[in-house]
Design a protein with these regions (language model features):
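Active-site cofactor/cluster-binding pocket
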Residues: 1-214, 218-220
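Thiamine diphosphate
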Residues: 2-66, 70-83, 226-322, 331-352, ...
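Gly-rich Lys/Arg/Thr-decorated short loops/hinges at beta-loop-alpha junctions or inter-strand turns
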Residues: 4, 152-155, 179-196, 211-215, ...
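Short gly/pro/ser/thr-enriched loop/turn and capping motifs at secondary-structure boundaries
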Residues: 42-45, 99-101, 118, 228, ...
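Short beta-strand segments
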Residues: 73, 93-95, 114, 272, ...
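A short helix->loop->beta-strand "cap" motif at the edges of active sites that frequently abuts
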Residues: 86-92, 106-108, 243, 292, ...
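Flexible, low-complexity linker and terminal segments
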Residues: 200-208, 212, 344, 349-586
Length: 586
């Protein structure tokens, strides 16, 4: 028996590859295993290779596995492009229809099974996925009851006949594999687990749930990969809190609607990806100038321009910090996994209202669309804090006929914020430079005072946990620094290095702007070499760190920009190279 294994299904896009992986993963989640799933797919509806890789474990996992134990292949291309992940004790279960051939250098065992032919005998080739799931069950010695329950839940609305024939396809696949088990070399059975029940969700769903838990009642957005699932989640769930979602004509309309709703006192947000954020920049500046709270979710993808819409990248960082024209107060935070996405999204809504400025939650495709185990969420962990909002009438002197000082020059830069309709709170609002009442002003002294007031709000800002750190060594050989979805690969690769006697500390940065300089500097001082891991060509995170931390003599970039996520073995191999260089320097 194994403590963990990796399973992948592959074929042509539009053939149910995603749903096949979803059925397998959901069943394993119900059996209380820990999971990490990642889909490879193209920017098209049908055609082209796609796959869904699921890592299943008796203990928590946070990264894509380096290798592959079981490959379900519906065509030859799936074998050709994935066999390099397999070992001698791995297995390929291939559809006989594809007339599969092992490529040169492929050491895995190949078993042909009539997935499509069996499905056609039952009525339709579409059920080949169920036949494959059944074969997987037999190979892994899994009871099919959980799969049968899932099939019943999935197809009950289509009638008993549809449920029955899909369960029959499942069992036919099970029997096909059972008859071939004597030929199998290797162990594909998992150890049992006594873990408590847990969730299995994509990062975008966690973001949507976090927004609702934070009290958001309005979202405006335009569909874009890989952010659309946030909007889809909100559409499905926001009515439960008497909220609404508007699909706008473009991203400019989306962000300005969100600003308007926030001005009216409703917690509101928008979500998009790089191209959409480019269109939103002027409006984000409006949020900063008018000191109107705004939460924006940016799920990064491959750029520039249309770029690689369905591939992994982290190349929007500089734009998120410096993209608007002019200087505005702005907060940029970055979750480290799906669970953190829930909590940090909740916190983002608090920050937006407390500091009256735009807050960008920076995700990436791997975190947003990757699916992973999430422990039971604590809805009371983050208290809703609305800052200096005024929702009841303001008592003013009878002879005070002037506008309310919405932009009063306070010591911390945060001014009282009456929502429209509050008696005594009338004020002017404009994107033009303004005085304390909001009226346009070009006075040099007023400009200086208002600019300093706005920027003063975030000068000392440090969120509750600006980094997620593992600083177990006072004299580390290597400090790995990353952000967003690189956490899992860094964590696992670093654990391997530590086991080999190479002392490694790690940091995932959650607060990117304003930058938590002192926290990072302390960690840097404890390491001989600092390696910044990120998915972009220029090393944007490394540049931000260099701008804020005394680190130039020990920093090294480790960038990847081919659209694929970092794997644990890449972090491990990089660490070995660095450790060798350190020894040679001594």
């Amino acid at each position: 028996m194994k403590p963990q294994l990796s399973w992948k299904v592959g074929g042509q896009q539009g053939e149910g590859i995603e749903s096949t992986g979803e059925i397998f993963a959901t069943a394993m989640n119900r059996k209380r295993y820990y999971l990490y799933g990642y889909r490879h797919f193209s920017s098209r509806i049908k055609g082209g290779h796609t796959n869904n890789k699921i890592r299943v474990s008796t203990t928590p996992v946070h990264a894509i596995s380096d290798d592959l134990d079981i490959l379900i292949a519906f065509d030859q291309e799936t074998i050709d492009v994935n066999h390099h992940e397999m070992r001698e004790d791995s297995i390929i279960l291939a559809d006989a229809k594809a007339k599969p051939v092992k490529p040169e250098g492929c050491h895995a065992q190949l078993i042909e099974l009539p997935f499509t032919a069996t499905a056609k005998e039952l009525g339709t080739a579409l059920m080949k996925n169920m036949v494959a799931i059944g074969a997987t069950s037999a190979l892994m010695n899994l009871n099919t009851n959980t799969f049968e329950e899932l099939i019943t839940n999935m197809f009950s609305k289509k009638g008993d006949k549809v449920v029955e024939v899909n369960i029959q396809a499942l069992n036919e696949g099970y029997q096909l594999m059972q008859s071939r088990l004597p030929e199998i070399d290797g162990d594909f059975e998992l150890e049992s687990t006594d873990a408590l029940p847990h969730l299995y969700m994509i990062g975008n769903d966690a973001i949507g749930l976090g927004a609702i838990a934070a009290g958001s009642q309005f979202m405006a957005a335009y569909p874009i990969t890989p952010a659309s699932e946030v909007m889809e989640y909100m559409i499905a769930n926001i009515s439960k809190v008497n909220g609404a979602v508007i699909q706008t004509e473009d991203e400019i309309a989306a962000v300005t609607m969100a600003i308007g709703a926030n001005y009216g006192g409703v917690r509101a947000f928008t979500a998009s990806a790089g191209p959409g954020l480019s269109l939103m920049m002027e409006a984000i500046g409006l949020s900063g100038m008018t000191e109107t709270p705004l939460v924006i979710i940016n799920t990064q993808r491959g750029g520039p321009s249309t770029g690689l819409p369905t591939k992994q990248e982290q190349s929007d960082l500089m734009q998120m910090i410096y993209g608007t024209h002019g200087d505005i107060p702005k907060i940029v935070v970055a979750p480290t996994d799906a669970e953190d996405a829930f909590y940090l999204t909740m916190e983002a809504f608090n920050l937006a209202e407390q500091y009256q400025c735009p807050v960008i939650v920076l995700s990436d495709l791997q975190l947003s669309l990757g699916k992973q185990t999430v422990e039971k969420l604590d809805y009371n962990r983050i208290e809703i804090k609305r800052g200096e909002i005024i929702q009841s009438d303001i008592e003013r002197e009878e002879d005070d006929k002037g506008y309310f000082k919405r932009y009063a020059l306070t010591s911390n830069g945060v001014s009282p914020r009456p929502i429209p309709g509050v008696k005594g709170g009338i004020h002017h609002i404009t994107g033009v430079e303004h005085n304390e009442e909001g009226k346009p002003s070009e006075s040099a002294s007023n400009r200086q005072q208002q600019m300093e007031k706005r920027m003063r709000k975030i000068e000392q800002l440090v969120i509750e946990s600006p980094v997620e750190a593992n600083l177990q060594h006072e004299d580390a050989d290597i400090l790995y620094i990353g952000f967003i979805s690189t956490k899992g690969a860094i964590q696992e690769g670093s654990n391997r290095l530590n086991q080999q006697g190479i002392k490694v500390n790690t940091i995932q940065i959650r607060q990117l702007h304003p930058f938590p300089t002192s926290v990072i500097q302390d960690a840097v001082n404890k390491a001989k070499k600092v390696v910044v891991v990120e998915h972009n060509y220029l090393g944007q995170l490394a540049s931000i760190i260099k701008m804020n931390v005394n680190i130039h003599d020990k920093i090294e970039n480790y960038t990847k920009y081919d659209g694929t996520p970092f794997l644990p073995h890449e972090i491990e191999e990089k660490g070995k190279i660095i450790a060798t260089e350190i020894k040679e320097m001594v």
